[in-house]
């Protein structure tokens, strides 16, 4: 199944980054470019369009030339709120979401998720040890359920994904591609990589 003409890539950069001391994680530099740019650059060859979901420093993200989507729900309620805002503000049926702190996304992420979808409205990455529900291919058809879930005060991504009939896709052969950058110490370790 090849959906690359109709999938919009979304870099999720709207979090509070508490473990990063509150710094806007997407704007932290790795190898001379911001973390969000690593993700956008990895997604761009796989998709027709890439947008950014962000809540702070919107002018900096907008300077990239990419469309920037702020959350429609106040107070940084989490990645599901960013996903809902994208559904509300961007046309299309399919969206590939990826957090800004995963700088080594594989070149075949979209094709592998799409090929293993098997009719599900949501599929996400499993690296062989853990789920990565914010690295997910999601159909707009879940928007009503997502709206209701958030209105009920729920925020847990994994529970929502399972409730709407999603499943994980095995990426255990490239587990290292899903190591993310959560703390200043982890960023320092990433800076030492070749």
Curated annotation (Swiss-Prot):
One Pfam match: NTP_transf_3
Stored PANTHER family: MOLYBDENUM COFACTOR GUANYLYLTRANSFERASE (PTHR19136:SF81)
GO annotation, biological process: bis(molybdopterin guanine dinucleotide)molybdenum biosynthetic process
Protein's name according to its UniProt entry: Molybdenum cofactor guanylyltransferase
Family stated for the protein in its record: Belongs to the MobA family.
Source organism, top-level taxon: Bacteria
SUPFAM superfamilies referenced in this protein's UniProt entry, alphabetically: Nucleotide-diphospho-sugar transferases
Lineage: Bacteria, Pseudomonadati, Pseudomonadota, Gammaproteobacteria, Enterobacterales
